[in-house]
């Protein structure tokens, strides 16, 4: 049975968390978004702890967050020069920003909200957050 375009869109775009849709976490290469049956795989790849963290950050910040990079398939991660053990490949990391970003302020909110890994990227105006299970801090000024 062929679905209508509206039904196809509704099946593809699934709300995960309070503020985010699954497509916001998709690998930008779009190579591995669906399984062999045509079902969206992102709801199985993205760690719920990450979604919960981002919801808390968004709530605390009070303005929309934008996900620059969420899940990355291993191939795309290698293409962009990501670490081989990148949290993005595990579905446990996101690079986030907001309009008028203050990197230090966003990083402090991420820490208050329980982020494990926090990377400040001042030159590109985003903060990496993850739920790796232990604390890690870095920035692009080092």
Protein language model regions, located:
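Intrinsically disordered, low-complexity segments enriched in small/polar residues
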Residues: 15, 36, 80, 112-117
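Amphipathic alpha-helical interface surfaces
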Residues: 46-53, 63, 76, 92, ...
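Short, exposed beta-strand "edge-strand" segments with a Pro/Gly-rich flavor and a Y/T-containing core
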Residues: 11-20, 65-70, 99
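Extended, low-complexity, intrinsically disordered C-terminal regulatory tails
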Residues: 51-81
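The N-terminal extracellular segments of secreted preproproteins, especially immediately downstream
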Residues: 26-28, 72, 112
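Extracytoplasmic cell-surface/polysaccharide-interacting catalytic and binding patches
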Residues: 1-60, 124, 133, 141-142
């Amino acid at each position: 049975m062929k679905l209508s375009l509206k039904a196809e869109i509704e099946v593809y775009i699934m709300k995960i968390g309070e503020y985010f849709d699954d497509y916001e976490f998709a690998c930008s290469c779009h190579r591995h978004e669906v399984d062999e049956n045509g079902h969206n795989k992102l709801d199985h790849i993205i760690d719920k702890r990450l979604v919960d963290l981002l919801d808390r950050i968004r709530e605390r910040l009070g303005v929309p967050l934008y996900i620059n990079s969420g899940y990355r398939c291993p191939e795309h991660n290698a293409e962009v020069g990501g670490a081989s053990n990148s949290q993005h490949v595990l579905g446990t990391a996101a690079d986030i920003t907001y309009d008028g970003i203050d990197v230090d302020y966003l990083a402090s909110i991420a820490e208050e909200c329980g982020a494990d890994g926090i990377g400040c990227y001042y030159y590109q105006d985003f903060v990496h957050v993850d739920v790796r299970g232990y604390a890690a801090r870095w920035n692009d000024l080092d």
